[in-house]
A protein has these predicted regions:
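Glycine-rich phosphate-binding active-site loops on the catalytic face of alpha/beta enzymes
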Residues: 369-391
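Generic structural signal for well-ordered, non-membrane alpha-helical segments
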Residues: 45, 49-56, 66, 70, ...
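Acidic/polar loop patches that form or flank catalytic/metal-binding clefts of enzymes
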Residues: 342-348, 378-383, 413-422
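Catalytic-core signal marking the mid-to-C-terminal active-site face
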Residues: 2-9, 13-29, 43-55, 63-64, ...
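Helix-rich catalytic cores of soluble enzyme domains
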Residues: 142-373, 377
Length: 515
C-alpha cells in the first residue's frame, strides 16, 4: 500500500530548524504532471499490431536474446521454462508476455515533497530533463567537459522550471569527480537541491545499491521498502543483448521495488533494421524480454516500456533526429506498450544541432509533439539535449523547458463548458464588432492564451532598442536570472548530515578511479 512520505522536518532531529526553513523558503510554481485529455495517434491497425507482435515472439523463440556474463539470469530463465544455450536465451512463444502480466500498469514515484510526487502510466505524462551528456555548452564558455558545479546548476534550473515534473538523473556527466564516486554526489544533488522525484545510478550494481541506501536515509527505510522513490534507466545493448552491468542494476532496483525503464537504444540501420516494422519488431522483442526478466526477479516490480530510436544519415553515419521514421516508430511502440498494459517512455527535445539554433528548434519540436500524440507517459530528455546527446546546453535547457508549457495546454483538450463555448461574447459583440473590450474577454484574457516566459513578443522597434537579442541570448539571460534567485528547498539538517556521512564513508572505502 502506497503511503505519504513522513514529514522531513520531524525525523532524525533538527525539526525546529527544518520548520523555520520551511516557513522562509521561496516557493516556485510547479505544474502537476500532464493529464492527457486528447486521443493518441494510432499509426497501426489491428492487423499490423498483430503481425509485429507475432514477429517479436518469433524473434524471442527462434533467434533468442543474449544475457552476457550473467549466470544468475540464465538460471532464472531456465527455471522459468526458457531454453538456454550458452548465453543465448530462447523464450517460448507467449512466455515473456505471461511474465509481463504481473507488472503494474501505473505506479506512483514519490518525491520528498509529497506535492511533487508523480503517477507514471495511464493518461499521465511526466517530463524529465536531458540525461547523460559528457559535455556542456553555454554562451559564456562554449563547449567543454561538464563539472559537478554544472550538474548542480542543472538540478537547480530543473527545480525552478514550472513545466518540468522530474529532476532526472545524470543531467550531465561531472568529469571532475572520480567515475566510481560521482554517483554519490549526483544523487545528493538531486536530494538536496530539489524536492522533485529523481533517478538512481545504473553504471554499476554497487552504485544502484548506494542509490537505494541514500533513499533510505532521505525517506526512511520502511517507506522505501513499501513505495517507489526512484525510476532508473536500463538501456538494452541493442540488438538483443542484455549486459551484466545494466542487468545487475535492474536486479538491485527490482528487488527493492524501485522502477526501471527497460529501453532499447537503437540507431536505425546500425542497431536495428532500416524499416519501421522491422525496428518495431526488435523493440517489442527486447522490451518483452527485459520486462519479463524484471518480473522474474520480483513479480510486480514497477517497469516502463522504453523506446529510444533515431535514424541514421546513410552518408555520414551520424544519427539524425526529428525524422518522420523515428516518429512512426514512437507512435507504433506506444500502441504496443498500451496493448501490454505498461507505462511508456519515449520522445524528448532531441536534435543533432551543435547550437541552440533553428535546427535544434525544428528537430526538438517534431519529437516533443510526436511524444504527446504518441501517448508517452515518461519523457526523458525533455529539455537541454544538444548535439545528439553529447552536450547539455544551459540555454536550450530553459528554452525547451519553457516550450513544455504548450504540451500541457494542448493535452488539456477543448473546454466545452458554458464559459468555453463563448456564446455570451458572441451575443454581446455581434456582427462587425471586436472582442477586446467585451465582458467575456475581460473575464478570461489572463488565462486564455499560453504565453512564453522566454521568447520575445515585442514590436521590432522595441526589440531593436533592447539589443536585438536572439533566442539563445534570451535563454542565457533567463539562466542567469534563475540561478541568481535560486533558493534550496527545505530539508531536515539531520538528514543532510546523515547523507554526507554516508557519502564520506563510501568514498573512503575505495581509491579514486577515472576510468
Amino acid at each position: 500500500m502506497a503511503q505519504t512520505p513522513p514529514a522531513r522536518s520531524g525525523r532524525r532531529g533538527g525539526g525546529g530548524a527544518a520548520r523555520r526553513a520551511e516557513r522562509t523558503a521561496v516557493r516556485f510554481d510547479c505544474a502537476p504532471a500532464i493529464r492527457r485529455r486528447i486521443g493518441t495517434f494510432d499509426i497501426l491497425d489491428e492487423e499490423g499490431l498483430s503481425l509485429i507482435e507475432a514477429n517479436a515472439e518469433t524473434v524471442l523463440e527462434e533467434i533468442g536474446v543474449r544475457f552476457a556474463d550473467n549466470p544468475g539470469a540464465l538460471a532464472r530463465w531456465r527455471e522459468a521454462g526458457a531454453e538456454v544455450r550458452g548465453e543465448m536465451v530462447h523464450i517460448p512463444r507467449g512466455l515473456a508476455r505471461r511474465l509481463c502480466a504481473t507488472a503494474p500498469g501505473r505506479f506512483t514515484q514519490h518525491a520528498r515533497n509529497p506535492e511533487r510526487s508523480v503517477e507514471i502510466g495511464g493518461t499521465s505524462l511526466v517530463l524529465a530533463p536531458v540525461y547523460g551528456p559528457p559535455f556542456v555548452r553555454d554562451l559564456d564558455g562554449g563547449r567543454r567537459y561538464a563539472t559537478m558545479e554544472d550538474f548542480r546548476n542543472f538540478v537547480r534550473l530543473g527545480y525552478m522550471s514550472k513545466w518540468l515534473h522530474h529532476s532526472g538523473g545524470t543531467v550531465c556527466e561531472p568529469t571532475d569527480v572520480p567515475v566510481n564516486k560521482r554517483h554519490l554526489d549526483m544523487i545528493e544533488a538531486h536530494m538536496t537541491l530539489s524536492d522533485k522525484p529523481f533517478m538512481g545510478s545504473v553504471t554499476d550494481p554497487t552504485r544502484a545499491v548506494d542509490s537505494v541506501r541514500m533513499c533510505e536515509i532521505l525517506f526512511g527505510k520502511g517507506f522505501v521498502s513499501e513505495n517507489t522513490v526512484m525510476t532508473s534507466l536500463i538501456n538494452i545493448n541493442s540488438p538483443l543483448t542484455f549486459d551484466s552491468v545494466m542487468m545487475g542494476a535492474l536486479e538491485v532496483y527490482a528487488q527493492a521495488n524501485q522502477a526501471c525503464i527497460i529501453s532499447p537504444f537503437i540507431v536505425g540501420g546500425a542497431m536495428a533494421p532500416v524499416t519501421v516494422a522491422g525496428t518495431l519488431t526488435q523493440v517489442l522483442a527486447e522490451v518483452l524480454a527485459g520486462v519479463a526478466y524484471a518480473q522474474l526477479v520480483r513479480p510486480g516490480a514497477p517497469v516502463i516500456f522504453g523506446t529510444f530510436v533515431t535514424s541514421i544519415d546513410m552518408n555520414s553515419g551520424a544519427p539524425t533526429f526529428g525524422t518522420p521514421e523515428a516518429s512512426k516508430i514512437l507512435y507504433g511502440a506506444g500502441q504496443l506498450a498500451r496493448r501490454l498494459g505498461l507505462p511508456y517512455r519515449s520522445g524528448g527535445a532531441l536534435c543533432g544541432a551543435k547550437l541552440p539554433d533553428a535546427q535544434a528548434g525544428y528537430e526538438s519540436a517534431n519529437t516533443l509533439n510526436a511524444a504527446l500524440l504518441g501517448g508517452v507517459n515518461f519523457m526523458l530528455h525533455a529539455c537541454g539535449w544538444l548535439e545528439g546527446g553529447l552536450v547539455a546546453s544551459f540555454e536550450k535547457f530553459v528554452l525547451d523547458a519553457d516550450q513544455l508549457g504548450p504540451l500541457h495546454a494542448l493535452a488539456s483538450g477543448v473546454d466545452l463548458s458554458e464559459n468555453g463555448q463563448g456564446m455570451e461574447a458572441l451575443r454581446e459583440v455581434g456582427p462587425g464588432g471586436h472582442f477586446l473590450g467585451c465582458a467575456h474577454t475581460q473575464a478570461n484574457y489572463r488565462e486564455a492564451f499560453w504565453r512564453s516566459e522566454v521568447l520575445d513578443y515585442k514590436p521590432f522597434e522595441t526589440w531593436a532598442e533592447e539589443g536585438g537579442r536572439d533566442s539563445a541570448t534570451l535563454g542565457q539571460a533567463r539562466v542567469k536570472r534563475m540561478l541568481e534567485s535560486y533558493q534550496r528547498p527545505p530539508l531536515d539538517p539531520a538528514i543532510e548530515e546523515a547523507l554526507a556521512a554516508f557519502i564520506a564513508e563510501r568514498k573512503a572505502a575505495e581509491p579514486d578511479a577515472f576510468a
